[in-house]
Amino acid sequence: MTENIHKHRILILDFGSQYTQLVARRVRELGVYCELWAWDVTEAQIRDFNPSGIILSGGPESTTEENSPRAPQYVFEAGVPVFGICYGMQTMAMQLGGHVEASNEREFGYAQVEVVNDSALVRGIEDALTADGKPLLDVWMSHGDKVTAIPSDFVTVASTESCPFAIMANEEKRFYGVQFHPEVTHTRQGMRMLERFVRDICQCEALWTPAKIIDDAVARIREQVGDDKVILGLSGGVDSSVTAMLLHRAIGKNLTCVFVDNGLLRLNEAEQVLDMFGDHFGLNIVHVPAEDRFLSALAGENDPEAKRKIIGRVFVEVFDEEALKLEDVKWLAQGTIYPDVIESAASATGKAHVIKSHHNVGGLPKEMKMGLVEPLKELFKDEVRKIGLELGLPYDMLYRHPFPGPGLGVRVLGEVKKEYCDLLRRADAIFIEELRKADLYDKVSQAFTVFLPVRSVGVMGDGRKYDWVVSLRAVETIDFMTAHWAHLPYDFLGRVSNRIINEVNGISRVVYDISGKPPATIEWE
């Protein structure tokens, strides 16, 4: 039997903050399993989960509104530590007898709080000291409402001039509230506070580590599928690659990977995937060359959303056909990760407006009665990468920049043609190669080239040429929700432009995209 890595667990109730997933990732980084649930859970669900502690997230609502979200009352009766963050602190204060008022001024940004009373949450944690020796903490505030009276059995732990109750605590019940965000890096000691709560106050052991996660996943896969055969769509992306390696470790040759080469991949990507997984790691791979089929389906289509749907539909068709050729396959594996599960769950915190449709395997083949294997569904992307390293996958492959599911289908603007894809592949490879050579690749969050269906006059030797235009795009971001364009050196951009125009016959002009997100999106389509 493998160790129970879910034995100690934290429940995070989501009130809608943009930082809630970051809270969960921080808890996981501390080696402790946690799950993220909507705030309106039932007492029975909490009892069934049996958490070692509960965190109440921040949120955009006002606790002073009549129908604003509230924590289930059982949260405060379960006998486990509770940590309220921002809105989570406000609803805790209000529900336990304190008072919250709407503030005329939003407090947003850096603040320094002074610790005025001892608490297990911040004992020995400080960024600086006042003249009379009291600890100061540098924190990140983001709130409109504020607590104006704490519950009678709480004490004030820290305050600022504008926020008299920046930290409150009931040490006996192990209830804590902070009016700032410990999960963001701007709160310099935030990770230590979370560690103090999770590891010391909740007494959770660090059982959630890459090696133990792998052992647990392998055991669970074997228990789920036994000696049955499993099929997986392998794209060469991080999620499907790590899924393939976990399944291979668990069931060996009973796994068949289907690699669909849609003609929309990066330069030499198909060969690299086949070499690494087939030749090097010894996985059983079915290679399906399907470039003509995808490009035929895309012919004449200019609309980005329609292109995405065509690519998704054709992939499912091709995958289904290959699956039907295999005998006795009982299970379909997918690289679903935890954020996919969170996004697809019906959450009372509301849904973001759909900007672009997400590309994924469209479901099980209709003719096949297969079960679903999702070994990554509890993991965040950063955890998937760490597991990939532990399984022996190369760093460069696991940490390369994001690549959209539809591939070059949404990086060739307008109609997708083989000629355009071939030009774009070579131009993009030059851009990425130069970024690596200049030690800039890991300094930007994402970089790629876009093919513009526009011809431009150029000069080559004594002649004029009338060829295509490409745009370089590089951004810096923490969460991909917002992004700044990367200020790459002019001489570097000039070098990339010269190489592309001289080495890629058919491109006459290179431009650089200096749009931020918002108002632009990172991808052009």
From Swiss-Prot:
EC number: 6.3.5.2
Catalytic activities: XMP + L-glutamine + ATP + H2O = GMP + L-glutamate + AMP + diphosphate + 2 H(+)
Protein name stated in the entry: GMP synthase [glutamine-hydrolyzing]
Stretches assigned to the Glutamine amidotransferase type-1 domain: 9-207
SUPFAM superfamilies linked to this entry: Adenine nucleotide alpha hydrolases-like, Class I glutamine amidotransferase-like, GMP synthetase C-terminal dimerisation domain
PROSITE patterns linked: GATASE_TYPE_1, GMPS_ATP_PPASE
Name of the gene encoding the protein in the UniProt record: guaA
Role played: Catalyzes the synthesis of GMP from XMP.
Gene Ontology molecular functions: ATP binding; GMP synthase activity
Subunit comment: Homodimer.
PANTHER family tied to this protein: GMP SYNTHASE [GLUTAMINE-HYDROLYZING], GMP SYNTHASE-RELATED
Lineage of the species this protein comes from: Bacteria, Pseudomonadati, Pseudomonadota, Gammaproteobacteria, Enterobacterales
